Amino acid sequence: MSDKKRINQIAKETGLTNAELVSAAQTLGFEVKSHSSSVTAEQAEKIIQSAKTGTDQTAKVAEKPVKKSQPKAAESAKKNKEDHPRTFAGKAVVEDPAILARIKAKEEAEKAAKVEVASTEHPVVTEKPKASEPVKKAEPKVEAKSEPKVEKVETKDNTATSKAEVKPENVADKKEPVVTEEKKKSLTQKPRIQIKVIKRAEDIKKEQAAARPEKKKFDKNRNDRNNRSDNRRPNQNGNGQGGNHYDKNRSSGQGQNQGQKRDKFASSGSAPATDSFTPATSGKTSRRDRDRKKSDNNRDNTKDGNRKGGPLRVNDNRNQVRNARNSNWNQKGGRGRYQNNQSSSVPATQRKFHELPESLEYEVGMNVQDIAKSIKREPAEIIKKLFMMGTMVNQNQSLDEDTIELILMDYGVTPVKKVEEDKSDIERLFVEDGYLKEENMVERPAVVTIMGHVDHGKTTLLDRFRESRVTEGEAGGITQHIGAYQIKANGKKITFLDTPGHEAFTSMRARGASVTDITILVVAADDGVMPQTIEAINHSKAAGVPIIVAINKIDKPGANPQRVTQELTEHGVFPVAWDPENGSEFVEISAKFNQNLDELLDTVLLVAEVQELKADPTVRAIGTVVEARLDQGKGAIATLLVQQGTLHVQDPIVVGNTYGRVRTMTNDLGRRIKEAGPSTPIELTGLSDVPQAGDHFAVFEDEKAARAAGEERAKRAQLIKRQNTRRVNLDNLFDTLKEGQTKSVNIIIKADVQGSAEALAASLQKIEVEGVKVDIVHSAVGAISESDISLAAASNAIIIGFNVRPTGLAREQAAQEEVDIRLHSIIYKVIEEVETAMRGMLDPEFKEEIIGEAIVRETFNVSKVGTIAGFMVIRGKVARDASVRVIREGVVIHDGAIASLKHFKDDVKEVGNAQEGGLMVEDFNDVEIDDTFEVYKMVEIERK
C-alpha cells in the first residue's frame, strides 16, 4: 500500500510490537483498533516516534517496579518461605538503618492495616501518579485497577525518598539478584503505574475518604477479576505457574491480571510473609469487604431486575464465578451486549377488554379460531362454551351454520350469514349496473360487423377500407374465421368484424352479431337475397342491432338494386324512405371500384352518433373472445374485443374456462401495444389453454383470484358435460337399440382456429346418411401431433386437418399405425369427402329378383344321393348359382339353394325356357310331382 500502512507492517519494519504501536496510536488520538488497522505515512512516523519514546522511558523508569510482578514475587516468596522472611513486606530490600528505624516505629497492627488499605484502596493511589507521570500515559486505564500486595508493600519502603522516577534508582542500589532477574523478565512489559509511594495509614485513610466517589467506578472490574482469580486458584501449581500462563495469553493483561496475581500469591503458600504484615483477622475482613462491594456492584448494575437474578449468593461459589465472569465481559458503561436482554421487573400489563360487536357476518365453515378473532375472545373460552353445550370441537375444526349461530347468540352477538359472491361468474359484469360509473363514461368507437352471403364481396369491402390485400390470404376466396380490424374515418375510429358467409359458420355470424353495434348487410346486386343473407338479417334482429344495407356489385351488367330492395322488404328490412322510424339505410356501392365507399362510412358514423356509444375506461377490462387458436411457438392465442375498461399487459385475466396473465398484446397491424381501450381488437398470449370463440373475458385483481375463478369455471364446464350423458329409459329405449345397430364414423378434427374447428364439427354432424352417423372423438386447434395419432389408432378414427399439417414424427407414426389423415383448406370439400366415406361404410342392400319358374314332371330316388326332380321351365330360366323355393299348392314348403343342375346327363350352369332338366335341392328330398320351383337371385342395390 503506497498511501497507508497497516500496524502489523509497521511493526515488522521497526521491530516494535503490535501492542506498543496500537497503544501509541490510541494515545495520539488516531482511530486504530487493532494491528490490522491502517494509518497514513505521516501518522505512522508519529506513532513510531511515540512508541520508541515510550519504550525507552519504560526501560529506564518503570521496568524495575514492574519487575515486582505477581509471579516473580510469588516465586521469591516461595523460595524464602521458611528461611528468608525478608522476601516479603520489604525485608528483602530494606537494609538502610534509617528506614529500618522508621519501620520498627510502627506497630504490627498498623502494618496490617496499611497492607489491607493498600490492597483495597490501591486504585485511588494509582490515579494520582498516573496524572503526574507522563511516561505512563500509554498504559490502558484498566491496568491501573488492581495491584498485588507485595509490590505495594515493597514500594512503601522505597517511597520515603522520592516518586516513581527515584524509586528505580533506590531499588537498584538495594535490591538483591532476585530483583535483577525479575527486571530482565519484564523488559517487554509496560511500566506499571501501580507501584506508587504508599503513605502512612492515617494519610491513606484520609485519601480514601476524599477519593471514595472516584473509587466506585473501579470497584466493579476489580471485584470481577478477583472472583475470576478465585475460580482459577484450584488450577494453579505450587509456584504460581498457572497465573503466569493465563497472563501470557492476554494481549493487554498487565493491569487486569495484577489482581489475580495478588490473590494467587496469597494462596500459593507464602504464609510467613503474609503473617509478617497481616493479622489473623485481616483475611476475613478483606473477604467480607469484597462480598459487600460485590453485592453493591450487583445492585448498581441491576436495572429493574438483573438477568442474573439479583444479588449474588455468597454460598454458591459456582454462581459467583459465572456471574462475575459475565459481568466482567459486559463492563462497557452499561452498554454490554447482554444489557438489552435484561428482563424487566415491571409487572405484565393486563389484557385489554374488547367490547363484543352487535352483529357478526359469518360464513359456513368457520372454525373456533376465526370466531375468536372476530369477537376478540380466547379460543379456549369458546371451546369451553361449546363443551358445556354438548359439542366437542377443537379450534381448527370447521363448524356448521347452526353451531356458529348458537355460539354467537350465546355471546349476545347477532349472527348474519354472509352472502357469498360467485367471483367465477364473469358474465354478471356485463349486466351489473354498479360495475360502470356514469361520471367516467366517454365516447367509444363503434363496432361494425360485415355480414352477407358467400362471395357477395364482404372481404373485398373491408379490404378497401383497410387498403390491404386481405382477400388474397383466403383459401378459395372464402373467409373462414373472423377478422377484427380498426380503421379511421373522418378522424374517428371504427372497429370492423369480418364474419364468414358460408352456411357452416352460423355460430360465428351469431357471435359477431352479439358483440357488434352496427351491422353492414352486403347483398350482391346481381344475385339478390340468398339463404345466408336471410340468416344474417335474423341474427341482427335477434341482437337488436341496426342494419345498414350495402348493395354491392352495382358495376356489373346484370345488377338490379331495385329487385334487391324489393326482396329485402319481404324479410322485414325497409328503406328509411319507406319507414322513417324503423327503416334501414341503403347505400349502393361497388367495392371493386371504390364507388360510394365514403358515403357508406359517413352513414356508419351517423348511425353510431345517434346511438351515443359510451364506455368506462377506468374499470377492469371485460370483453368477448372473437377467435382463438394454438400456435406451436407461442401457445394459446386469443383474439379479443375489449368492450369496457382498459386491458394492460401483465393483467391477470380469465377467458372462458381458462385463465392466465396477459403476456403480450398486438393490434390488428401486428404491432405490440401496452394497453387497449374500449372497442379495441387485440391478439394476446399468456393463457393456460385455448378458449372457445364467443367466451367472455374479465380482468381480476390478482393472479391468485384469476386462477381460482378459471379452475372453478373449468370444473363446472366439465360437470355440465358429464351431465349431458344420455340415460336409457323407456322413452328412448327404442332409439338406443336402433343406434346400437347404426354404424358410426369416428373423426378427429384439428383446425387452425377454434371457430373453424367448431364450424367443421357442426357441419359434419349434420350429414344425414341412413345407418351411419358422425362421432367427433376430439376437436382442437393446433398441428396434428403424435398424441392425435395415438388417439386415432385407439378409437379407429379418421383425422381431418383443417389448415394444419402433421408434424414429422406424427406422419411417421401414422404410417406405422395405418391412421388415415385427410388435410383440407376448404370446408365444403371436407363435408363431401366425409359424406362419401359414410356411405361407403354401409352394409350393401339387396333386393330379390325372380329369374325363372319350373314345374316338376317326375321324381327319381337315387340311393346315397337323394331325390332328383325332373322339371320343365315354363318361364325365364333356372341358374346353377340361384336359389329356389319349393311351392306346393301355393305354400312355400322349402327355400334353399340348388345343389346340382343337369341337362340330360351333362352338368350345366343354367337351363333355358321351355327346356327340361333335372335338379336336386340342397338339404331337401321331399319333392313331389306338380310342385313348383320359383328360382330367384339377391341383387345388390346402390345406397343413396
From Swiss-Prot:
Residues 267-280, 317-331, 338-348 have a biased composition (Polar residues). Residues 452-459 are annotated as: G1. GTP binds at residues 452-459, 498-502, 552-555. Disulfide bonds: none annotated. The keyword Nucleotide-binding applies. InterPro entries: EF-G-like_DII, IF2_II, IF2_N, P-loop_NTPase, Small_GTP-bd, T_Tr_GTP-bd_dom, TF_IF2_bacterial-like, TIF_IF2. Residues 590-592 are annotated as: G5. Its main location: cytoplasm. Transmembrane segments: none annotated. GO terms for molecular function: GTP binding; GTPase activity; translation initiation factor activity. Residues 75-86, 124-157, 164-185, 199-233, 286-307 have a biased composition (Basic and acidic residues). Residues 498-501 are annotated as: G3. Residues 477-481 are annotated as: G2. Residues 552-555 are annotated as: G4. One of its GO terms (cellular component) is cytosol. One of the essential components for the initiation of protein synthesis. Protects formylmethionyl-tRNA from spontaneous hydrolysis and promotes its binding to the 30S ribosomal subunits. Also involved in the hydrolysis of GTP during the formation of the 70S ribosomal complex. Belongs to the TRAFAC class translation factor GTPase superfamily. Classic translation factor GTPase family. IF-2 subfamily. This is Translation initiation factor IF-2. It comes from Lactococcus lactis subsp. lactis (strain IL1403) (Streptococcus lactis). The lineage of its organism: Bacteria, Bacillati, Bacillota, Bacilli, Lactobacillales.
